[in-house]
Amino acid sequence: MGRVIRAQRKGAGSVFRAHTKKRKGEPKLRHLDYAERHGYLKGVVKQIIHDPGRGAPLAVVNFRDPYRFRLSKQLFIAAEGMYTGQFVYCGRRAQLQIGNVLPIGLMPEGTIVCNLEEKTGDRGKLARTSGNYASVIAHNPDTKRTRVKLPSGAKKVLPSANRAMIGIVAGGGRIDKPILKAGRAYHKYKVKRNCWPKVRGVAMNPVEHPHGGGNHQHIGKASTVKRGTPPGRKVGLIAARRTGRIRGGKGDEKFKEKEKK
């Protein structure tokens, strides 16, 4: 084994610390209080802003504090169709309009929502990426649970008291535009994380990576490794159940169609 490899130098394990420099703030729903549980609050969208490192724009919404004579500023993930000067209503008595926040149990089946709470009062955890949305499928009034279809296609049963914003997250189609230049990729990943550019192991020297070296770029041995492999050797396909192309599936059918063409 040669030098300390890249996977060892990272050293933080599975703990991810988000880059917060230049960020505008953490966009969340309002704290769940008495006003939202029994009525509604009215807010005004003051500004639509860009948050570095985030694909979706943010909406700066000013609410009048229900308990004190002051305004409270809140950052929301902007839904598609929101605009400056729009009135936003939060609470169980709010109307079904884009940008409004209300419990999913009060929404009709088929409603498109975003920034959905996973647990009641957690201020939004699901369907927050640009262009993403979840849809309300069915309600069970006996158990006070609601069935929701998530952006991944998975169906999840959540408490009907969980809140969500009506609409689709703005910024959809962002990944359709090609990056084209390495300079753009540099600026993109600089604010998101520090893993770019990522050099392939086979392009390194043998002291820098287990896959490095050779007269041409090849791994030279099986790329699968055990789960308990020591850190300097634990690269490649870790504890793989199987390798190679999946035959007989959707991917294989697409490959055969390309061959025919």
From Swiss-Prot:
UniProt keywords, alphabetically: Cytoplasm, Ribonucleoprotein, Ribosomal protein, RNA-binding, rRNA-binding
Entry's Gene Ontology molecular function annotations: RNA binding; rRNA binding; structural constituent of ribosome
InterPro entries xrefs: NA-bd_OB-fold (IPR012340), Rib_uL2_dom2 (IPR014722), Ribosomal_uL2 (IPR002171), Ribosomal_uL2_arc_euk (IPR023672), Ribosomal_uL2_C (IPR022669), Ribosomal_uL2_CS (IPR022671), Ribosomal_uL2_dom3 (IPR014726), Ribosomal_uL2_RNA-bd_dom (IPR022666)
Coiled-coil regions listed in the entry: none
Subcellular compartments: Cytoplasm
SMART domains: Ribosomal_L2, Ribosomal_L2_C
One GO location term (cellular component): cytosolic large ribosomal subunit
UniProt similarity note: Belongs to the universal ribosomal protein uL2 family.
Identification of the protein by name: Large ribosomal subunit protein uL2
Gene behind this protein: RpL8
